[in-house]
């Protein structure tokens, strides 16, 4: 796709809106999604809407930054410093970013069955997904895996959080939960487990066996992504939970 062409000059089946309607939003490049929000182009060299979307990403990505990470926290004034982005375009972008955040912040009602990592992530997103500091939280469940509540145990720094098995199980027992899922976030968005994450999970699984409170999973969340340690490790084979 040529970024200096007007959208009207692009073949119909290659235009962002038409491609989204035909194939769904996942096939669109980020610049094309932004183009739909912008509606029109301009900026340096009279760019098309797609070209302006690409230019915006390049500007946000200066100094080797992740442009989408910057976009999540950008202000209207910062957006409007980019040539071609005025108040109307800036507010459209920011409204879309905020709407995306809110969809991840939906929390299931209490007593909702938590039967998959996706369901657990939905319950934890408000507390963990978009936070700038690492947080450690627990999902409190009853014997039928129904949600009793969530609880943030600790809040750390941008790169680490401190949570001990003692603190975690104390809160689980205090709240009267009979099963649990633990989770923490990585503000970087990289949801691969660290060696420390693996070791803490090992300790928690051993403690859960001793206390008779099955630990169903340990999730890592960050910037719209998640990882289930139960799915990517063999720890639950080493420490069966009787679930």
From Swiss-Prot:
Cited NCBIfam families: PRK00024.1, radc
Q: Which GO terms describe its molecular function?
A: DNA binding; metal ion binding; metallopeptidase activity
Q: Which ranges carry the MPN domain?
A: 113-235
> Binding residues for Zn(2+), per the UniProt record?
184, 186, 197
- Leader peptide range in chain numbering: none
Q: What is this protein called?
A: UPF0758 protein Ava_0172
The UniProt annotation puts motif JAMM motif at: 184-197
In its keyword annotation, does this UniProt entry include Cell membrane? no
User: Sorted alphabetically, which PANTHER family does this protein's record hold?
Assistant: DNA REPAIR PROTEIN RADC, UPF0758 PROTEIN YEES-RELATED
Against CDD domains, the record matches this protein to: MPN_DUF2466
Q: Does the keyword Cytoplasm apply?
A: no
Report the sequence similarity comment from the record.
Belongs to the UPF0758 family.
Q: Keywords, A to Z?
A: Hydrolase, Metal-binding, Metalloprotease, Protease, Zinc
Q: Which InterPro entries match?
A: Hlx-hairpin-Hlx_DNA-bd_motif, MPN, RadC_JAB, UPF0758, UPF0758_CS, UPF0758_N
- Matching Gene3D superfamilies: Cytidine Deaminase, domain 2
What is the source species? Trichormus variabilis (strain ATCC 29413 / PCC 7937) (Anabaena variabilis)
GO process annotations (BP): DNA repair; proteolysis
């Amino acid at each position: 796709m040529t970024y200096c062409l007007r959208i009207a000059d692009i073949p119909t089946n290659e235009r962002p809106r038409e491609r989204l309607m035909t194939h769904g939003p996942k096939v669109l490049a980020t610049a094309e999604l932004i183009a739909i929000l912008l509606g029109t182009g301009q900026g340096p060299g009279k760019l098309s809407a797609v070209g302006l979307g690409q230019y915006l990403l390049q500007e946000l990505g200066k100094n080797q930054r992740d442009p989408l990470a910057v976009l999540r926290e950008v202000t209207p004034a910062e957006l409007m410093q980019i040539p071609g982005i005025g108040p109307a375009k800036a507010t459209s972008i920011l409204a879309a970013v905020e709407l995306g955040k809110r969809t991840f912040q939906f929390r299931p009602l209490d007593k909702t069955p938590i039967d998959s990592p996706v369901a657990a992530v939905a319950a934890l997103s408000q507390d963990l997904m978009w936070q700038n500091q690492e947080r450690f939280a627990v999902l409190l469940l009853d014997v039928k895996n129904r949600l009793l509540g969530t609880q943030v145990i600790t809040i750390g720094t941008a790169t680490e959080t401190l949570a001990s098995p003692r603190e975690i199980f104390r809160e689980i027992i205090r709240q009267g939960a009979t099963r649990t899922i633990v989770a923490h976030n990585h503000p970087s968005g990289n949801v691969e487990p660290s060696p420390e994450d693996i070791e803490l999970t090992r300790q928690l699984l051993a403690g859960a066996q001793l206390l008779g409170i099955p630990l169903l999973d340990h999730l890592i969340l960050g910037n719209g992504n998640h990882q289930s340690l139960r799915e990517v490790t063999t720890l639950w084979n080493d420490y069966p939970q009787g679930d």
